[in-house]
From Swiss-Prot:
It comes from Deinococcus radiodurans (strain ATCC 13939 / DSM 20539 / JCM 16871 / CCUG 27074 / LMG 4051 / NBRC 15346 / NCIMB 9279 / VKM B-1422 / R1). One of its GO terms (cellular component) is ribonucleoprotein complex. This is Large ribosomal subunit protein bL36. Keywords: Metal-binding, Ribonucleoprotein, Ribosomal protein, RNA-binding, rRNA-binding, Zinc. HAMAP family: Ribosomal_bL36.
Amino acid sequence: MKVRSSVKKMCDNCKVVRRHGRVLVICSNVKHKQRQG
């Protein structure tokens, strides 16, 4: 899980999701997991 000020899709499988007021990127590739913070 990377914590970034700007979360971007890193590949076609990445999805940008909002959960509990946080912006997350979920992906089948574990290295692409990000959250905004």
